[in-house]
């Protein structure tokens, strides 16, 4: 359950996330009858966005803040604190000025927190042997059917946002565990604070179960 006092959520936009996002969105835009029936990736193919390397920083990694009721009068402040006590101030900027400009659309401007949940929806694949026919996949408004079929994007995806702030992480961060703390303040002075934990390592560990740790074999 979401805390009723909560007003925002945080995420990291990494190069891997943007590549993953772009590939699935490209598939989504293809003709339904001629495209491959299975999307190019699922959520299982997205590398952990809370585990970074220097390569991720060099390619551009942003801390993103979706302030749900954010406006041009909202103020957003952020800090990074490493596990040894070192602290860095970040300067989040709103991705849209809200001055009547065209929306910025695409991986660079997407909300990673929302998009990760929208681009690989598992309930499309729900299926059973003895259940009712209408319980396979899922139903939407007026009984429209979805699935059963491989997990895929839902209808609406957060590929643009009028209340998203972001701050690029420094390229020269040292390895360690970091906590990003973000406070947003609305025009009435009401503040909301959230934190996001991530780790910066020299290299990523293996993604899958390591039998060599247990049995001494690859």
Region locations from a protein language model:
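Metal-dependent phosphoesterase/phosphodiesterase active-site architecture
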Residues: 1-218
